[in-house]
C-alpha cells in the first residue's frame, strides 16, 4: 500500500476502530502487519516469535485506541509497542542459543504444503543466509532491509512506515548492502518475502478483538504471556476447546434440570456461546488460505448455533412445564449433534491443516494444546461430566 494511501486509510478507519468496529481494525492490521512483524523479527530473529509479538502488539493497541487522539500518531505508537514487546521477549530468551530449529520452522511457514527434499534444502539454506545477514546488521538496518524487500523495494514506502526520511532509509540500505554479498542479498529477498505474514495473520488478530472492546482488560487476560502457548498464537487457551463446547452445551440445561437457579443457566448459555465462537479464533491459527479460514468460520457459526440451541431448548421446555424426561431427550439429541460436529466435521476440516502443521514442526501429531482441546479423550471426559450428574440425580435418587 502506498504511503499516501495508508495515511488516508488510517485517518478513515481509526475512528471506526476506536468506536469498536472490528472490521475497520482488521483492515488496519492487514495494512500494517508487514511493518510490525518486520520490526519484531529484526529484534528477535525468530519468525514464530515475531508473529506472536506482532499479534500481541496489535491487540494491545486495540485495547488502548481510546488513548490515541491523532491518527498520525498511530504508526509511531504501534512501532514502539512492538519494539517494547520484542525487547521483553529477547530479555526473557537471552540465554536461549539460536539454532537451526527456528530457521527450519520459518522456512516451513513460508513453504508450500508439500515441498520436495531439494526445495526444503534450498529453503533452509536461504533461511541460514538470512540469519547470517541479520546477525551482521544492527537492529535499525534489519528493520529497513526486511521492509524494503517486503514492500517491493520502495525506499519511500519504507521511510513512511518507519517514520524516517527517504534519505535516511537509502543511507542505511547502502550501508547494509556494503556489509553483505549480493548472493546473500538475493537469498534475503526470498526470505523476507516468504516470511511475511499472510491472510491468516490478520484474520486471527481480528477474531481476537471479539474478546473485548477497546478500553477493557479482558483481551489481556485471554492473551496471556508471550510464548506461553508454545507458538500457537495469542488467543489464550482458557475455554477454547471442543471439550468445553461439549460439556458447556449441557451446563445450562443441567443447571435447571438438576434444580439450580435460572441465573446459572443463563450464565452457562452465555459462556458456551462465547466459548464456541472463541474456539474458532484458535482454530484459525492453522489456516493459511482464505478457503481454509472460511471453512473454519462456517464450522464456528454452526457450532455456536448448535450449542446455543442445545442449552436453550431444554430450558424452554421446562419453562413451559414439559416433563423432565422430554427435556433430557432434547438435551441428549443436542449433545449428539455437538459431538458429531466436534468428532466428525471438525477433523475433516482440520486434517490437511494439522498435517501441514505437523510437517512444519517435524512431528506426526497435532500440538498438545489441540489434543487437550479437541481429542476424543477430551470429549469423552466432558461427556462423563454431563452423564454422571444425570445418572446420580435420576438413577441413584430415583427421581422422575
Curated annotation (Swiss-Prot):
Is Nuclease given among the entry's keywords? Answer: no
A biological process (GO) of this protein is: DNA-templated transcription initiation
Q: Which residues bind DNA?
A: 165-184
The record, for CDD domains, names: Sigma70_r4
Output the SUPFAM superfamilies linked to this UniProt entry. Answer: Sigma2 domain of RNA polymerase sigma factors (SSF88946), Sigma3 and sigma4 domains of RNA polymerase sigma factors (SSF88659)
Query: Position of motif Polymerase core binding?
Result: 62-75
The family database entries (Pfam families) matched by this protein are listed as: Sigma70_r2 (PF04542), Sigma70_r4_2 (PF08281)
What terms describe the molecular function in GO for this protein? DNA binding; sigma factor activity
Q: Which UniProt keywords apply?
A: DNA-binding, Sigma factor, Transcription, Transcription regulation
Q: Does the keyword DNA-binding apply?
A: yes
Q: Where is the signal peptide?
A: none
Function comment: Sigma factors are initiation factors that promote the attachment of RNA polymerase to specific initiation sites and are then released. This sigma factor is involved in lipopolysaccharide biosynthesis and pathogenicity.
The record's similarity note reads: Belongs to the sigma-70 factor family. ECF subfamily.
Q: Give the matching PANTHER family.
A: RNA POLYMERASE ECF-TYPE SIGMA FACTO, RNA POLYMERASE SIGMA FACTOR RFAY-RELATED
* Protein name listed in UniProt: Probable RNA polymerase sigma factor RfaY
Q: Which organism is it from?
A: Xanthomonas campestris pv. campestris (strain ATCC 33913 / DSM 3586 / NCPPB 528 / LMG 568 / P 25)
Gene responsible for this protein: rfaY
Amino acid at each position: 500500500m502506498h504511503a499516501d494511501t495508508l495515511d488516508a486509510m488510517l485517518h478513515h478507519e481509526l475512528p471506526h476502530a476506536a468506536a469498536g468496529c472490528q472490521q475497520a481494525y482488521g483492515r488496519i492490521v492487514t495494512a500494517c502487519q508487514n511493518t510490525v512483524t518486520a520490526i519484531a523479527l529484526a529484534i528477535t530473529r525468530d519468525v514464530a516469535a515475531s508473529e506472536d509479538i506482532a499479534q500481541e502488539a496489535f491487540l494491545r493497541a486495540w485495547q488502548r485506541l481510546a488513548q490515541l487522539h491523532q491518527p498520525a500518531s498511530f504508526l509511531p505508537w504501534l512501532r514502539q509497542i512492538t519494539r517494547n514487546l520484542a525487547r521483553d521477549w529477547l530479555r526473557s530468551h537471552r540465554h536461549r542459543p539460536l539454532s537451526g530449529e527456528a530457521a527450519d520452522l520459518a522456512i516451513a511457514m513460508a513453504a508450500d504444503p508439500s515441498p520436495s527434499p531439494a526445495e526444503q534444502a534450498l529453503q533452509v539454506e536461504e533461511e541460514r543466509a538470512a540469519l547470517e545477514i541479520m546477525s551482521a546488521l544492527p537492529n535499525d538496518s534489519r528493520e529497513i532491509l526486511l521492509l524494503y524487500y517486503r514492500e517491493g523495494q520502495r525506499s519511500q514506502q519504507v521511510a513512511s512506515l518507519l517514520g524516517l526520511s527517504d534519505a535516511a532509509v537509502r543511507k542505511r540500505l547502502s550501508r547494509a548492502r556494503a556489509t553483505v554479498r549480493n548472493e546473500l542479498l538475493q537469498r534475503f529477498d526470498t526470505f523476507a518475502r516468504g516470511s511475511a505474514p499472510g491472510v491468516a495473520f490478520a484474520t486471527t488478530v481480528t477474531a481476537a478483538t471479539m474478546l473485548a472492546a477497546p478500553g477493557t482488560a479482558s483481551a489481556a487476560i485471554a492473551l496471556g504471556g508471550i510464548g506461553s502457548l508454545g507458538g500457537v498464537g495469542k488467543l489464550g487457551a482458557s475455554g477454547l476447546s471442543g471439550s468445553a463446547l461439549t460439556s458447556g452445551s449441557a451446563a445450562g440445561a443441567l443447571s435447571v434440570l438438576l434444580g439450580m437457579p435460572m441465573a446459572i443457566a443463563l450464565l452457562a448459555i452465555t459462556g458456551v456461546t462465547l466459548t464456541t465462537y472463541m474456539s474458532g479464533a484458535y482454530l484459525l491459527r492453522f489456516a493459511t488460505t482464505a478457503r481454509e479460514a472460511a471453512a473454519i468460520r462456517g464450522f464456528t457459526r454452526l457450532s455456536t448455533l448448535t450449542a446455543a440451541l442445545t442449552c436453550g431448548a431444554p430450558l424452554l421446555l421446562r419453562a413451559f412445564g414439559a416433563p423432565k424426561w422430554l427435556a433430557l431427550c432434547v438435551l441428549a439429541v443436542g449433545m449428539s449433534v455437538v459431538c458429531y460436529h466436534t468428532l466428525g466435521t471438525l477433523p475433516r476440516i482440520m486434517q490437511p491443516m494439522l498435517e501441514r502443521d505437523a510437517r512444519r514442526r517435524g512431528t506426526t501429531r497435532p500440538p498438545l494444546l489441540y489434543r487437550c482441546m479437541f481429542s476424543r479423550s477430551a470429549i469423552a471426559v466432558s461427556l462423563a461430566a454431563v452423564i454422571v450428574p444425570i445418572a446420580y440425580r435420576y438413577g441413584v435418587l430415583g427421581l422422575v
